[in-house]
């Protein structure tokens, strides 16, 4: 997520970036927008997401941050990897 917005009023762009880049550094592709302070009827934050782009990047091995992972789950784009621990007998 790339932080934009005014002081004490954060707004974020959901972006694809190289893991070695800074938080607000070089961006490969912008795939969404997140406003945690937006006033909506249900009291949920405003999220705009390009679902096709998100699925494409996840299929290519992109790893979302914890926050973006939660947003993707809410949009039903991301499913948690199942635990691969064997059952004990």
Curated annotation (Swiss-Prot):
Assigned keywords, A-Z: Ribonucleoprotein, Ribosomal protein
GO BP, sorted A to Z: translation
Family the entry assigns: Belongs to the bacterial ribosomal protein bS16 family.
Protein source organism: Gloeobacter violaceus (strain ATCC 29082 / PCC 7421)
Gene Ontology molecular-function annotations: structural constituent of ribosome
Gene this chain is encoded by: rpsP
Superkingdom to which the source organism belongs: Bacteria
Ribosomal protein in keyword set: yes
Name by which UniProt lists this protein: Small ribosomal subunit protein bS16
Gene3D superfamilies given in the database record: 3.30.1320.10
UniProt keyword Ribonucleoprotein, yes or no: yes
Listed Pfam families: Ribosomal_S16
GO cellular component labels: cytoplasm; small ribosomal subunit
InterPro entries: Ribosomal_bS16, Ribosomal_bS16_dom_sf
């Amino acid at each position: 997520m790339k932080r934009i917005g005014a002081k004490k009023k954060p707004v974020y762009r959901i972006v694809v970036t190289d893991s070695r880049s800074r938080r607000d550094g070089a961006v490969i592709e912008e795939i969404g927008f997140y406003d945690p302070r937006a006033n909506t009827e249900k009291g949920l934050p405003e999220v705009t997401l390009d679902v096709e782009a998100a699925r494409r990047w996840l299929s290519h091995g992109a790893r979302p941050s914890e926050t973006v992972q939660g947003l993707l789950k809410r949009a039903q784009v991301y499913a948690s990897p199942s635990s691969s621990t064997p059952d004990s007998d």
